[in-house]
């Protein structure tokens, strides 16, 4: 079913406006994918007709999603036939492998099934997460650095297109966990970051793109897997937090996803004592979590999936599929043993532990989603040309644009960036890692400046390290390009690398790699995070250094004590050039004293705020804003503020002329002005010194309202105004 994006957006706005405050039970927001279907007679008729044809055991089977390997062995084909013909499962999840094998098995399975199967996929960063030879998109932690969420929406649309191409209707993505624990062994870069608001925005943008492309999004891992140090694949993590903490961090993205009308939710294997007091009971099996919190309190009406029930985080809880359905889940994912677990559900109904109405309601919901996702009739994937359709030029361009939009300038001390193009001045490029990996960077840099390339090899001797440091010290600017992720062999060099010249670090690696050389990075004049060493990213970073391209990324997760979440300096082609003071005979140390002078003036009440700009030979040496507009509580002064300047003739005319003459030694500041202007010797100005003139303290009014002269026509003999231009007007 194709959903027009504008309609989805409109419905999102309606849905978002119907939710009450978090302190109250949320008003119901129907998921957008089924919003229209619930009023669609054809949908209800199809669901009713299928329900009438299914036995009760088959209705139970519709609630199970079986995981199978995409291989065409005899044993695997027999297993596929068994789970479809005997257990009548409602869906399949293929583990990793070849795309062609998965598609062939999907077509075979759909032909065998009595009711079209819901084909699911675990593709957090696209099909490449599970299938070889597919387009590789950036990880979520990288995408979290992108400011423009429209790109995330476009990304979701593209992943949906690819899923539909291979016969997939459900993607178990996005990860809505807030990764505020850097030691998290399982979520980490799968998360969009550590700011709950930013994570929520990214989740909604990506998931809305998926669903507008006709694929069900599934936010995971409810109620939040971000602040754990245990992998739920191996054991049961515990979230020992208060409810207030859960509401503000872990639950926040999920609540916003519900408000946005997204259709799927996966419950993780997590122990949350403040919600579920039974020790060792995972959220996926807890009615307090699934039904009371997710379905009732948060009013989620979409499809609820368990995380994979084969994981060790849920082991030791008896028949976990039965427990999951009793807790309120709609579909159980990856059951261990269908032969035991489906009969256990039927037996529980006979005992009154579950009602037939529960199963009927869940089955009806599953069928409604199948209808909406285009499964009202069987369809098959066309294998011919499939790989070319997925790996399209448009897809490659989107991957490129996502990577470029994530480039983040983490800091820019003394406005060292952008650099100015100057073929007469050579910049040193130190390449850390295989020099061939940063050839694209070096080639692009050479377009703007003369370049001297140096290579830092792993495990150099201290003598070799010192020779390299000495060589680099002869350059006025140094660019350090890091493409190597294991920096331990390079630490001895960086431990003593504190150059006097500005050093600009470029990381074509995950951001956390810079923590291995933290001291050197802290000393850097600028740090740019490129995330990957693709040629496109390298060329873009080179362009950003010279303001030939834009960069406006913001850090999605803090990097130790180096950079906080949200760090990011915007560089655009309009960013003014700044220059190194020493190259023009000035001292950076002296310029730093400007800060204390400007702040002292604010403390003494001379002015509420100011901007100080130092130029030399037309180049900006210093540009910094201090204080506020009018005092405490008013907006801060920014370098982009526009000023109404008055009395400029003194500073831009007379003062500059005097400064020039003084530099040439033509007078001393203690000279009397009449010594240089003889006509003043017979006036009361004869004893005034040049220094006193520069104080500008005559006591005259600060300005004269000349415009008032135009009000009184008698003040001027003649016509003040004319309807046309002439020699007088």
Where are these regions (language model features)?
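Bacterial Sec-dependent N-terminal signal peptides
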Residues: 1-29
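Short, acidic/polar
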Residues: 71-85, 152-162, 247-254, 316-323
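Short acidic, glycine-rich surface-loop motifs adjacent to enzyme active sites
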Residues: 81-97, 182-183, 258-281, 473-485
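Short, conserved catalytic-motif segment at the N-terminal edge
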Residues: 583-645, 666-668
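Active-site-proximal loop and beta-strand segments within enzyme catalytic domains
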Residues: 616, 628-729
């Amino acid at each position: 079913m194709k959903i027009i994006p504008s309609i989805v957006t409109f419905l999102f706005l309606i849905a978002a406006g119907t939710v009450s405050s978090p302190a109250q039970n949320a008003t119901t927001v129907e998921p957008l994918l089924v919003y229209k279907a619930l009023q669609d007679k054809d949908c209800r008729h199809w669901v009713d007709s299928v329900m009438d044809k299914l036995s009760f055991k088959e209705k139970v089977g519709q609630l199970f999603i079986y995981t199978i390997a995409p291989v065409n062995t005899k044993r695997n084909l027999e297993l596929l036939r068994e789970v479809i013909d005997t257990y009548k499962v409602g869906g399949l999840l293929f583990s990793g492998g070849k795309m062609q094998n998965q598609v062939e098995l999907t077509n075979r399975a759909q032909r065998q099934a009595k009711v079209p199967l819901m084909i699911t996929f675990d593709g957090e960063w696209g099909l490449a997460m599970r299938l070889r030879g597919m387009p590789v998109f950036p990880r979520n932690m990288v995408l979290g650095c992108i400011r423009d969420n429209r790109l995330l929406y476009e990304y979701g649309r593209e992943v949906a297109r690819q899923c539909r191409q291979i016969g997939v209707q459900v993607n178990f993505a996005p990860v809505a966990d807030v990764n505020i624990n850097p030691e998290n062994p399982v979520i980490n870069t799968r998360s969009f970051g550590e700011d709950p608001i930013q994570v929520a925005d990214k989740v909604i943008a990506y998931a809305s793109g998926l669903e507008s492309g006709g694929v069900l999004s599934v936010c995971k891992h409810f109620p939040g897997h971000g602040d754990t140090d245990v992998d739920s694949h191996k054991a049961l993590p515990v979230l020992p937090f208060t409810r207030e903490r859960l509401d503000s961090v872990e639950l926040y993205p999920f609540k916003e996803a519900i408000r946005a009308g997204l259709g799927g939710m996966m419950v993780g294997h997590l122990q949350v004592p403040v919600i579920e007091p039974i020790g060792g009971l995972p959220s996926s099996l807890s009615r307090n979590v699934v039904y009371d919190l997710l379905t009732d309190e948060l009013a989620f009406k979409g499809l609820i999936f368990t995380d994979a029930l084969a994981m060790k985080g849920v082991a030791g809880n008896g028949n976990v599929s039965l427990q999951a359905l009793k807790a309120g889940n709609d579909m159980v994912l990856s059951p261990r043993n269908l032969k035991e677990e489906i009969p256990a559900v039927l037996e529980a109904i006979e005992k009154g532990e579950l009602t037939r109405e529960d199963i009927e309601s869940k089955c009806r919901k599953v069928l409604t989603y199948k209808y909406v996702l285009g499964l009202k009739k069987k369809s098959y994937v066309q294998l011919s040309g499939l790989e070319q359709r997925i790996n399209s030029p448009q897809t490659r361009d989107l991957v490129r644009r996502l990577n470029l939009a994530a480039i983040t300038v983490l800091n820019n001390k003394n406005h060292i960036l952008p650099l100015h193009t100057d073929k007469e001045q050579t910049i040193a490029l130190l390449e850390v890692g295989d020099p061939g990996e940063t050839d694209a960077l070096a080639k692009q840099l050479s377009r703007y400046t003369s370049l001297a390339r140096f290579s830092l090899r792993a495990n150099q001797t201290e003598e070799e390290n010192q020779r390299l440091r000495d060589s680099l010290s002869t350059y006025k600017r140094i660019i350090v390009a890091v493409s190597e992720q294991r920096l331990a062999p390079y630490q001895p060099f960086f431990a003593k690398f504190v150059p006097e010249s500005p050093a600009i670090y470029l990381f074509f690696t995950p951001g956390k790699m810079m923590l291995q050389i933290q001291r050197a990075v802290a000393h850097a004049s600028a740090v740019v995070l490129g995330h990957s060493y693709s040629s496109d990213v390298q060329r873009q970073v080179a362009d950003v250094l010279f303001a030939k391209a834009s960069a406006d990324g913001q850090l999605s997760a803090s990097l130790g004590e180096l950079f906080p979440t949200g760090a990011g300096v915007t560089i655009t082609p309009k960013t003014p050039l700044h220059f190194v003071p020493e190259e023009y005979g000035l001292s950076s140390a002296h310029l730093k004293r400007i800060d204390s002078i400007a702040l002292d003036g604010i403390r003494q009440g001379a002015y509420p705020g100011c901007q100080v700009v130092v130029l030399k030979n037309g180049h900006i040496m210093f540009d910094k804003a201090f204080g506020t507009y009018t005092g405490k509580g008013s907006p801060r002064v920014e370098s982009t503020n526009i000023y109404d300047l008055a009395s400029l003739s003194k500073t831009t005319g007379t003062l500059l002329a005097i400064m020039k003459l003084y530099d040439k030694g033509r007078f001393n500041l203690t000279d009397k002005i009449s010594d240089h202007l003889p006509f003043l010797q017979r006036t009361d100005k004869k004893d005034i010194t040049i220094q006193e003139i520069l104080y500008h303290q005559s006591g005259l009014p600060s300005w004269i309202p000349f415009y008032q002269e135009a009000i009184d026509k008698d003040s001027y003999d003649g016509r003040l105004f004319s309807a046309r231009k002439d020699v007088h007007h």
